[in-house]
Amino acid sequence: MKMNKIESTIKNYIVRHNMWKHDGFYIVALSGGADSVALLLILKSIGMPVEAAHCNFHLRGEESDRDEQFCVDLCEREGIALHRIHFDTFTYAEKHKVSIEMAARDLRYRYFAQLAKDINADGICVAHHRDDNVETLLLNLLRGSGVDGLAAIAPQNGNILRPLLCISRQDVLDYLAEKKQDYVTDSTNLEDDALRNKLRHHVIPLLETLNPAARDNIAQSAKYLRQAKLMLDNMEKDMKPSDADDADSVIYIDKAPIMMAASQEFMLHKCIGNYGFHGDTIDNIMDALRNPDGGTGKVWKSNDYMLAIDREQLLITPLKALDNLQKEREF
């Protein structure tokens, strides 16, 4: 069967990003919405072996059950195996003191990871598209994110695959219209309660009145920023101490590569940001490093770590390890 333009675009994107292993098979996260329905049908059409997985979070009453039944009917018609699970999302959110959105995300990805292991799937395909990438970049820009956040959504993260990142939401809708395929609509996506929805319904359309190519241009910027992130991650990996992942070890970071970097603050943040040092603290540490004495002897604390400047290194010590040492001395 001949592939249409969208299917061909997706297949080329999958091949370019090495998402499809020989003889592998994949799980498609199927909500019943337009994006995931299109993803399922496209992957089936290009010959990618797939099974579907649906999560019922019981957040929208009868609408949640409607979505599940839609997925059951669709997979039966297409001859695709469907895995289903039900979650008490409200209880999980309350127990773990997280938002409903975060609870659903945690539950979803934990389930997908376990399911992939149970059925030996090679990857989990999720239906993020180019417009999701644009929204994510803008969200992270509003939050003051660095390159990591502005790089937005990666095509692949471990065994999580995003084959639709190369097409737009409108491409998805056009594909479904061409196939005469229906889908369900999550009524909460039409509300303006969430910041993402406000960006989707108001801010991005406004940007398009200023420049009709706004979505394409922002998505292209995200691509360039992802490439910059990969380069910086490789530099950071070269600088990372071998014991940096040991929860009880003192972490030693040489000053020299930071001081020789074209953007010293940026490199410092890449080195110590994961330990809870951000914003003004980064600026203050950098000011100290630039002093004639190199800031030797100065100390800062984050929620979990203490950073001290030595003559040639930054010493990062877990506060937990300091507490344990203090207890040993008292004993």
Name every feature range the model reports, one short phrase each:
Residues 92, 115, 207, 271-272:
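Broad structural signal for hydrophobic residues in well-ordered alpha-helices, predominantly aliphatic
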